[in-house]
Amino acid sequence: MDLTSMAMQETTAAAEEDRLPCSEVPVKEKTKKITWVRKWNSTDVFHILFIGGLHVLCLFAPSTFSWKSFWVCFALYAICGVFGTTLSFHRNLTHRSFKLPKYLEYFFAYVGLHALQGDPVWWVSTHRYHHKYTDTYLDPHSPIEGFWFCHIFWLFDSKYIIEKCGRYENAGDLMKQSYYRFLERTFVYHVYLQAALLYLFGGFPFIVWGMAVRTILGFHLSWLVNSVCHRWGNRPWNTGDLSTNNWFIAMLTSGEGWHNNHHAFEYSARHGIEWWQIDTTWYIIKLLEYLGLATDIKVPSEIHKRKMSFKN
């Protein structure tokens, strides 16, 4: 019996006992306890110091506020978060829902690197494992292991994640390209470069607003998709997992909160399937198509929609 089958059996057995709050899918929540007293590897130490340090820097936001710093924060969030993480890392690199000229693919991927959520290889690999093992005990950030585990604590136990999922075996399409191998090896140096440039052009206020506030905002909005959108919302599609559509999270994340749509049609470049579901990232992709830059754009067919509908 393979690991996927075992995980599904565990989830099915647990499902007979309890439900997550406000969810239509029954499952027993088994909180994953982070072992704080242990031998920490360098990855986990970096994660907790980096994320913790950024949160501490955010405490200086009121005293360092200026409109110039605010607009730097806003611009970098829009560019790195929307074009980088959402459009590039997620919809382009992970799911291959559309194609870009290689130079533009590489540029957007580098922009995504500066959202500071990890290098493209790590991000793509982790998210592909999430879709392969969605909401089972093999999911890297499974909601059945507790809200705070799937929101943030999973980042502090890389050994546990590797033991569950493996490393980059599912991201071979990126690892065979020297550009992505380079970004994977040198990620931390790009973090230092970003900090140095922000300090050079705006001093400590730019570090606080352009790096800390902007990055922490992006972190928690992305993490809310993992935690909230696998717990609260509506489920128009029969995905067999806990994914939900949450309009509030969708508004905050440029369309990523239409998460049940995404799990039903993960290959789709469009997450806001209905006309009224605002999906800013989709509008950008359509603009790129109009400019002749985005091609082979994938969206769900009416046949596939009928197949995935609860009304089927």
From Swiss-Prot:
Primary subcellular site in the record, as a coarse category: membrane
Motif (Histidine box-1): 90-95
Cofactor stoichiometry and binding remark: Expected to bind 2 Fe(2+) ions per subunit.
GO CC entries: endoplasmic reticulum membrane
GO MF term list: metal ion binding; oxidoreductase activity, acting on paired donors, with oxidation of a pair of donors resulting in the reduction of molecular oxygen to two molecules of water
Residues engaged in binding Fe cation 2: H130, H230, H259, H263
A Pfam family reported for this protein in Swiss-Prot or TrEMBL: FA_desaturase
GO biological process assignments: unsaturated fatty acid biosynthetic process; very long-chain fatty acid biosynthetic process
Binding site for Fe cation 1: H90, H95, H127, H131, H262
Keywords: Fatty acid biosynthesis, Fatty acid metabolism, Iron, Lipid biosynthesis, Lipid metabolism, Membrane, Metal-binding, Oxidoreductase, Transmembrane, Transmembrane helix
Required cofactor names: Fe(2+)
Pathway in which this enzyme or protein is active: Lipid metabolism; polyunsaturated fatty acid biosynthesis
EC number: 1.14.19.37
Membrane topology: Multi-pass membrane protein
Span of the annotated motif Histidine box-3: 259-263
Catalytic reaction list: (11Z,14Z)-eicosadienoyl-CoA + AH2 + O2 = (5Z,11Z,14Z)-eicosatrienoyl-CoA + A + 2 H2O; (11Z,14Z,17Z)-eicosatrienoyl-CoA + AH2 + O2 = (5Z,11Z,14Z,17Z)-eicosatetraenoyl-CoA + A + 2 H2O
Signal peptide: none
Sequence motif Histidine box-2, residues: 127-131
Annotated family: Belongs to the fatty acid desaturase type 1 family.
Domain notes: The histidine box domains are involved in binding the catalytic metal ions.
Cited function: Catalyzes the desaturation of 20:2Delta(11,14) and 20:3Delta(11,14,17) to generate sciadonic acid (20:3Delta(5,11,14)) and juniperonic acid (20:4Delta(5,11,14,17)).
Name under which the protein is recorded: Acyl-CoA C20 Delta5-desaturase
